[in-house]
Regions:
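Generic alpha-helical structural signal
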Residues: 10-11, 195
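C-terminal motif of bacterial Sec signal peptides marking the signal peptidase cleavage site
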Residues: 13-15
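Intrinsically disordered, low-complexity sequence elements enriched in Ser/Thr/Gly/Pro
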Residues: 1-2, 148
Length: 231
């Protein structure tokens, strides 16, 4: 039997205006709809190649007990950087927010989806022009909002080699990674000119696979902008 669990759901509020003070409509469904942007966790979940243990789910109990009632219980374990997950800013910025310190206002709000899938190559870097072109059509990225980058890489999910760019594991895999990410210039522009609480991308990292300095991580997380990966 394949057991699956989803750990994260993101809410897209289709608007480019500041988030409402009252989120009641989001939760009762009157202000929009819930969209699950996560990949399920299972034995086939794709992890960062140096996280080699993968997802583990162990059955502790399943069946009738001596007391006469049915009882099911499981234990799970997982490295941090696999499947759809949140990078807290402290991941690349010492002294910045840890997961439990991120307020709810840093995890929800109006979302903008910038689609670069039509031009994204395995080493594509999202540019300032990608962002300003989107704004020219849709308006300014929302204050207190979440920027989601669609590269089309989510369609490769399930094929580890196609998704990561290599079938290698461990440290030797890292130089062989190929997937799109956010360019350093675009990250700089965002922290200088816009007021986001989070970014997200449908690849294994907000930096592109060939990055050796993880500048998008460093720049954004230093400003307490969290990152969703493998969306």
């Amino acid at each position: 039997m394949t057991h699956r669990a989803s750990y994260l759901a993101l809410v897209l509020v289709a608007a480019c205006q500041p988030p409402p003070v009252d989120y009641t409509g989001v939760f009762d469904g009157s202000a929009g709809r819930w969209v699950d942007l996560t990949h399920s966790f299972s034995e086939s979940t794709i992890y960062w190649p140096t996280d080699t243990t993968g997802f583990e789910l162990h059955e502790l109990a399943f069946g009738p007990t001596e007391g006469g009632w049915f009882y099911a219980s499981y234990a799970f374990a997982s490295p941090e950087h696999g499947g759809t997950h949140l990078d807290a800013p402290v991941h690349f910025a010492e002294g910045q927010l840890t997961n439990e310190q991120i307020p709810l206002s840093g995890l929800m709000g109006p979302a903008a989806v910038v689609d670069v899938s039509g031009r994204a190559t395995p080493d594509y870097l999202v540019t300032v022009e990608d962002l300003t072109t989107w704004e020219a059509e849709h308006g300014q990225l929302p204050n207190g909002g979440i920027l989601l980058i669609r590269t089309g890489w989510a369609e490769r999910w399930g094929d580890r080699t196609a998704y990561l760019g290599t079938d290698l594991t461990g440290p030797r895999a890292v130089p062989e990674l190929h997937f799109p990410g956010i360019g350093a210039d675009a990250a700089d522009w965002l922290v200088t000119n816009r007021d986001l609480v989070a970014v997200g991308i449908d690849t294994p990292s907000i930096d592109y696979g060939q990055s050796a300095d993880f500048r998008a991580h460093v720049i954004l997380y230093a400003e307490n902008i969290s990152g969703f990966e493998n969306v």
